[in-house]
From Swiss-Prot:
Name assigned to this protein: Solute carrier family 25 member 3
Ranges: Solcar repeats: 58-142, 155-239, 256-334
Modified residues annotated as N6-acetyllysine in this record: 94, 204
Gene Ontology cellular-component annotations: mitochondrial inner membrane; mitochondrion; myelin sheath
Free-text function comment from the UniProt entry: Inorganic ion transporter that transports phosphate or copper ions across the mitochondrial inner membrane into the matrix compartment. Mediates proton-coupled symport of phosphate ions necessary for mitochondrial oxidative phosphorylation of ADP to ATP. Transports copper ions probably in the form of anionic copper(I) complexes to maintain mitochondrial matrix copper pool and to supply copper for cytochrome C oxidase complex assembly. May also play a role in regulation of the mitochondrial permeability transition pore (mPTP).
Gene name of this polypeptide: Slc25a3
Coiled-coil annotated spans: none
Transit peptide: 1-45
Mitochondrial intermembrane side: 46-58, 137-156, 234-256, 329-357
Record keywords: Acetylation, Membrane, Methylation, Mitochondrion, Mitochondrion inner membrane, Phosphoprotein, Repeat, Symport, Transit peptide, Transmembrane, Transmembrane helix, Transport
Organism superkingdom: Eukaryota
PANTHER family documented for this protein: SOLUTE CARRIER FAMILY 25 (MITOCHONDRIAL CARRIER PHOSPHATE CARRIER), MEMBER 3, LIKE-RELATED-RELATED, SOLUTE CARRIER FAMILY 25 MEMBER 3
Length: 357
């Protein structure tokens, strides 16, 4: 499967569309003979500096590694905030706000108590990041080749949504067991303090169901979140380079490009938090309680209940998403991976729409 995907990816429209236009000679007739030759020479040099080919197995593997770092490290870094957010969701009478939640946690558990659940967070979200970013690149290449160059451009937002949803479906299966353990450790005082204590206890009480009963609500939370995360990020980057950044992306330094990545990531993160928060509340309560179903929890929480802890989640997810995209893009820069620019309208489509002479 992966070999066929790699073969398709080499020809897909996201594989450096700017360079492809020059190579095909589509922009040649309007330029003197010398500049096009120089452009082709520079384009070739740019391709040669990459450590691997776009769509190759090495490319996808390194993208997955970037996902491991971006998701695993960032989620672990905000464990204290995540812990307070989860406790606000499952016990709103006791934890009435962010600062109140931190105060109570410090008083009852001490500073070390704020780090509860760091191990399942690191393991679970590293596995999720591997699948999320790695499979996103795979599905985006696969779907774009099915659509063709013109439809890929016209339906690019739908492409981002479909690719990210497909990737997140598999990513959540990898995340679910560790997410269940994390919530138990963070929200049930005295249940377990470490991952090694929680896993055997959960298995003894409920079997495998303890680890996967939350996968459906996890899909409810994470798939809309990831669809918004990737689609909003891709379109925001495109808009920033088009309307905000005063020069073309090709003329920006790597550092300037990474700043654009961070800003676009934060904007995407705010929308992600809002879209996914109700399901996040259900997941937190469901993993705390034994024998409950998602529909029962949703009915009990009500409309106001599912929005508890939203402000904390906006701060956490906005920062998380910005850092994740920054780290992911930095990994691509460090390993010299192909980083195609935002898509441009194909010349064939411009001619059909009468935008060229």
């Amino acid at each position: 499967m992966f070999s066929s995907v790699a073969h398709l990816a080499r020809a897909n429209p996201f594989n450096a569309p700017h360079l492809q236009l020059v190579h095909d000679g589509l922009s040649g007739p309007r330029s003197p003979p010398a500049p096009p030759r120089r452009s082709r020479h520079l384009a070739a040099a740019a391709v040669e500096e990459y450590s691997c080919e776009f769509g190759s197995m090495k490319y996808y593997a390194l993208c997955g590694f970037g996902g491991v770092l971006s998701c695993g490290l960032t989620h672990t870094a905000v464990v204290p905030l995540d812990l307070v957010k989860c406790r606000m969701q499952v016990d709103p009478q006791k934890y009435k706000g962010i600062f109140n939640g931190f105060s109570i946690t410090l008083k009852e558990d001490g500073v070390r108590g704020l780090a509860k659940g760091w191990a399942p967070t690191l393991i679970g979200y590293s596995m999720q990041g591997l699948c999320k970013f790695g499979f996103y690149e795979v599905f985006k290449a696969l779907y774009s080749n099915i659509l063709g160059e013109e439809n890929t451009y016209l339906w690019r937002t739908s492409l981002y949504l479909a690719s990210s949803a497909s990737a997140e479906f598999f990513a959540d299966i990898a995340l679910a067991p560790m997410e269940a353990a994390k919530v138990r450790i963070q929200t049930q005082p005295g249940y377990a303090n470490t991952l090694r204590e929680a896993v055997p206890k959960m298995y003894k009480e409920e079997g495998l169901n303890a680890f996967y009963k939350g996968v459906a609500p996890l899909w409810m939370r994470q798939i809309p979140y990831t669809m918004m995360k990737f689609a909003c990020f891709e379109r925001t980057v495109e808009a920033l380079y088009k309307f905000v950044v005063p020069k073309p992306r090709s003329e920006c330094t790597k550092a300037e490009q990474l700043v654009v990545t961070f800003v676009a990531g934060y904007i995407a993160g705010v929308f992600c938090a809002i879209v996914s928060h109700p399901a996040d509340s259900v997941v937190s309560v469901l993993n705390k309680e034994k024998g409950s179903t998602a529909s029962q929890v949703l009915q009990r929480l009500g409309f106001r209940g599912v929005w508890k802890g939203l402000f904390a989640r906006i701060i956490m997810i906005g920062t998380l998403t910005a850092l994740q995209w920054f780290i992911y893009d930095s990994v691509k820069v460090y390993f010299r991976l192909p980083r195609p620019p935002p898509p441009e309208m194909p010349e064939s489509l411009k001619k059909k729409l009468g935008l060229t002479e």
